[in-house]
């Protein structure tokens, strides 16, 4: 079985991709961080990504973001390990939302 990889994307690519049908943005920051500033999408803190996977099952493109890219990289790697998600495209916002502020 081959290992699935995620793809790093730029802020420009992120803003284009989040409007593509079948795409979902997953912000893995804590709720208070999300409430301070966000670029939309679904807020699922990193500690909850495994239990909330079913919320993402219907999407083909999953774009994971956080403040600086560290937590979102962990989440993207975790999502790539799900055998049932081999047909999904996993994206990671390189540099995080600091680039957007």
Q: What do the predicted segments below correspond to?
A:
Residues 1-23, 28-61, 70-101:
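Rhodanese-like catalytic fold shared by cysteine-dependent sulfurtransferases
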Residues 65:
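Short, surface-exposed ligand- or partner-binding patches at beta-edge/loop junctions that are enriched
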């Amino acid at each position: 079985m081959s290992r699935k990889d995620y793809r790093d994307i730029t802020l420009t690519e992120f803003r284009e991709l989040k409007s593509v049908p079948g795409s979902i943005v997953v912000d893995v920051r804590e709720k208070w961080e999300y409430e301070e500033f966000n670029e939309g999408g679904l807020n699922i803190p990193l500690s909850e990504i495994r239990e909330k996977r079913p919320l993402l099952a219907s999407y083909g493109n999953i774009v994971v973001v956080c403040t600086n890219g560290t937590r979102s990289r962990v989440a993207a790697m975790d999502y790539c390990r799900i055998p049932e998600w081999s047909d999904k495209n996993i994206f990671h916002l390189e540099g995080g939302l600091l680039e957007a502020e």
